[in-house]
Amino acid sequence: MILIDGKKAAAELRNELKQEVSELKSKHNKIPGLTVILIGDLTPSQIYVRNKEKSAVEVGLKSDVIKYPDTVEEQTVLDKINELNKDDTVSGILVQLPLPKHIDKQKVIETIHPSKDVDGFHPMNVGNLSSGYESSVPCTPLGCYLPVSYTHLTLPTICSV
């Protein structure tokens, strides 16, 4: 059995990302930016978003969080996403789930432009991923894969529990 040091893998990944962001800044003369939309006041979501913001800033990304009360109208959220889709200073958009019941999750996901879909949930990105084409990879599976990739083992030899 191999024990994976997740903290070490995360530190290595952060250093690599910091370098990549620095190179992107130099090459394109702009800072890549992540905008997270948080609706409501669920404590786990707030903690998760705060951690995303901290990690983004740590590697040199521009990070914005847009907060709405859980009573926000769906159209307000869709309008904001459309505005962010057109904003060249926003490289990625993430809408923190879960959403209040009156907001159609699928409609929200489909409104995010596929090239700015950080979660990889847009139907075009899901289709591309399942067909083997280049696409965004959903965060959770990627987050499971990356620490394993730092072991430099081939996946068929890895057993997880």
What are the roles of these predicted feature ranges?
Residues 95-153:
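Anion-binding alpha/beta catalytic cores of soluble intermediary-metabolism enzymes, centered on
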Residues 76-87:
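Short, well-structured alpha-helical segments in soluble
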Residues 56-68:
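Short beta-strand elements in bilobed, periplasmic/extracellular small-molecule ligand-binding domains
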Residues 1-26:
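Positively charged, low-complexity intrinsically disordered leader regions
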Residues 46-59:
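Short, solvent-exposed amphipathic alpha-helices that sit
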Residues 31-41:
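Short beta-strand segments enriched in small/hydrophobic residues
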Residues 152-161:
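Single conserved hydrophobic/aromatic residue that forms the stacking wall/gate
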